[in-house]
Amino acid sequence: MFRASKEKIEKGLNFQNVMLDKFNEHFKNVVDSRSYIMKLKPDEPEVVYNTFESKNGDIIIDDIHLECVTVAKSSIFPESKLRNFRGKKHYYIFRLDDTEETFVVPSYTWNCYMKKCKKIPKQGRMYRSFKASHIKGLRRKKTLDTFIQTIKGE
């Protein structure tokens, strides 16, 4: 099974924490999904928490589900995320490593785009390869601030 480097894991968790703080500045009902399910079901195996998070994202704001993703210039994206993270109010939040820009993309848009990208097997799992610059070219992307204003109804 593919294991991300410690540096990549820390970068992703740091980005997720930054996003939690940012959304907490603007909204009342911001939930870290893993913490939430662990409080509800404290003695479950790790797979239960992983499954919940894969379907609900990293952050939940009311009925909006957000999955935080840090992106290198050339990256891979897990097929399992394409299968599990979907719905009208599911969004990916991408932070581009090279420019430090942050964009929000509806899961439907991203999942459709990813299906056009090359499949890559890696240690028993399937991934799709893509470039960070492609995120900038998506018509349905929003900047983080614009996305927050949209949710707030401003």
Identify the residue ranges that each predicted region occupies:
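Nucleic-acid endonuclease domains
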Residues: 1-154
